[in-house]
Amino acid sequence: MKKVLIAMGLIFSISLFSSDNSSADWQIKTYSSAAPSFIGDFATVIGGKGETLREGSNGWTCQHGNPRPFPETGWKSAHEAMPVCHDDEGMKWMMALGEGTKPNLSRDSFMWMLHGDVGEDNLVPGVLDKKDTTPGQWIESGPHLMLMPKDPKTLENFTADFSKGEPYVMFPGTDYAHLMIPVEGYYQYQK
């Protein structure tokens, strides 16, 4: 019995080391699965420290979308990493949001986030702590597709109400307004 327990302990220890969420393998698998496989399997993958982990062949890029600093041991889960897959126009949008500048897109772009995100204010960009959120506007989303418009004004006739299950605008009235398109499982993290 003692040998069985020791063996089980060794197996458990080995499995802990093999699930290193900062590894290139984990990041490639996790980030590329933010989009359907026909996109993610052929996309370039950027690691948590900005390095290219895999060159792609389809013009799409997958990376973590969580704006918080990349943890030394990696993200705890795919959901926490908030992986996103986008094309070059989507990258322009991501960079502009991160730099606080106005996106300058040559056309509309789509982004996939099939692992969702860990929550933010639906009205105010950059508010990532629930206690600082506009009352009633905290949304922790499940799987979704996003439309990043070249001209955010084209979204003015869409609702900003995320509780209905229909496409809605996140960050309405700002340069970062985009259309959130919920897919199956979108509300799994709402409490």
Predicted stretch roles:
Residues 1-4:
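Positively charged n-region of N-terminal signal peptides that target proteins for export
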Residues 6-18:
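Hydrophobic h-region of N-terminal signal peptides that target proteins for export
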Residues 20-191:
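Primary mode marks residue(s) on the alpha4-beta5-alpha5 output face of response regulator receiver
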